[in-house]
Amino acid sequence: MINYYYETKFHLYNEFYFSKWIFFVVSKENKFIKELNFIFCDDQYLININNKYLNKNYYTDVITFDNSEDKNLDGDIFISIKRIKYNSLKFKKLFYDELKRVIIHAVLHLIGYKDKKETEKYIMSKKEDIYLFFLKKKYVC
C-alpha cells in the first residue's frame, strides 16, 4: 500500500500515476511493498524531523525512515516541497522532474541502495536515470 499525506498546500497531480511507477520500480528490483507513506511538507516541518530524530540542524529535501524487512518495503518518506522547488531552480530542472528524482531516490534507499561512496553514488544515479526513463517513455503508466 502506498499512502500520500500532505502537510502543505501542495498535492500530487495524480497519485495513481506515481503509485503505479513506484510499484513498477519495486517489482523490477524483486521487492514488494508492505507500506510506503509519502509525507509532503515544508522546510520547517522537515527540519523539525531532522532535529528530533537525526540530531541534525539543516534543511534537506528528503528524509526516509526505513522499517523494511527482507523483501518487504515499509517506510516513511518526508519530502520538503519548498526544498524541491529551490533545488529545481538551482539545478535548472523542472519542479516535477526534481520531485520524481527525489521520490525514486528515497525508494531506492528503501530497496537497499546506498550513496555514501562514489561508486554507490554512481550506481544509484544510474538506477534513478533508468527508472526516470521508464516513466518518461510511458513504459510504466
From Swiss-Prot:
PROSITE patterns: UPF0054. The keyword Nucleotide-binding does not apply. GO terms for biological process: rRNA processing. Its cofactor is Zn(2+). Binds 1 zinc ion. GO terms for molecular function: metalloendopeptidase activity; RNA endonuclease activity; zinc ion binding. The keyword rRNA processing applies. Gene3D superfamilies: Metalloproteases ('zincins'), catalytic domain. Keywords: Cytoplasm, Endonuclease, Hydrolase, Metal-binding, Nuclease, Ribosome biogenesis, rRNA processing, Zinc. Pfam families: YbeY. It is found in: Cytoplasm. Zn(2+) binds at H105, H109, D115. One of its GO terms (cellular component) is cytoplasm. Its EC number is 3.1.-.-. Its main location: cytoplasm. Single strand-specific metallo-endoribonuclease involved in late-stage 70S ribosome quality control and in maturation of the 3' terminus of the 16S rRNA. HAMAP family: Endoribonucl_YbeY. Belongs to the endoribonuclease YbeY family. This is Endoribonuclease YbeY. It comes from Karelsulcia muelleri (strain GWSS) (Sulcia muelleri). The gene is ybeY.
